[in-house]
Amino acid sequence: MRTEYADRLPVDWRDYVELCKPRVVLLMLLTVIVGMYLAAPGWVSLRLIAFTLLGIGLCAGSAAAINHLVDRHIDSIMARTKKRPVAYGRVSVKQALWFAVIIGLMGLSLLILFVNQLTALLTFITLIGYAGVYTGYLKRATSQNIVIGGLAGAAPPLLGWTAVTDQLDPQALLLVLIIFTWTPPHFWALAIYRYKEYQDAEIPMLPVTHGIQFTKLNIYLYTVLLLVVSLLPFVVSMSGWIYLLGALILGIRFLVWAHKLYFTDKPVVAMQTFRFSILYLMLLFVFLLVDHYF
């Protein structure tokens, strides 16, 4: 593999940025910010926001770098990922490992020193859950990898909440439940589009193990469940009418995409559904934030 020779090649700083999966981390940090503001009756101090985002962001980048490291052989097979820094050989295994360890320790240190120990602990558990349990084991072990491993990816709003309150709260767990329910239809839509690549890499994603039509049915059912779960903040008086209207519009639109995906054989619809799911989560959390203050 090219990775063997990466120590001899000049490394661009952009390769290290790519290791952190910045677009994924930015979406995650949006949910952290919303969690912080929903936990506070007023405004949150900029100092706390800065240290929380920096600490959690560094830890998320560390987990992403470990994902690149562990999945380098798989990534080299798949067209979508074969040019990732470690898989392509621009960053060596040793370089990626040291980078992940250093920024992970930096992130945890910032959280311990400037936020609180509970947030640092939960962030560490999340890092281990994603980088160790999901990437290292679940991804290759079961077709329910995304469902079980999705809990780690759903934690960011809880981390934002505890950064402000230094305690666990049922309302914060509601935000976790929303992302946890959103994760399967989000990733399974991509898995349908990339079906052949996952099959060639021998990754037991649901479309590979149970077929594409069965996966489409599961996407549809999870999208219905997501619509119901997304209304819970209004039901428990955590949010008001602005959020309810936004959640209904977004949820119904997501259902339309799931319906369209179920009844079509066009692969492009799976990618369109995947892309809408990202927009859905962004806007849903924006509605939560807007509703909180207006």
Swiss-Prot record:
GO biological process: heme O biosynthetic process
Membrane topology designation: Multi-pass membrane protein
Pathway of action: Porphyrin-containing compound metabolism; heme O biosynthesis; heme O from protoheme: step 1/1
Signal as UniProt keyword: no
GO CC annotations on file: plasma membrane
Enzyme Commission number(s): 2.5.1.141
Catalytic activity: heme b + (2E,6E)-farnesyl diphosphate + H2O = Fe(II)-heme o + diphosphate
Family: Belongs to the UbiA prenyltransferase family. Protoheme IX farnesyltransferase subfamily.
Protein name: Protoheme IX farnesyltransferase
UniProt organism field: Legionella pneumophila (strain Lens)
Recorded name of the encoding gene: cyoE
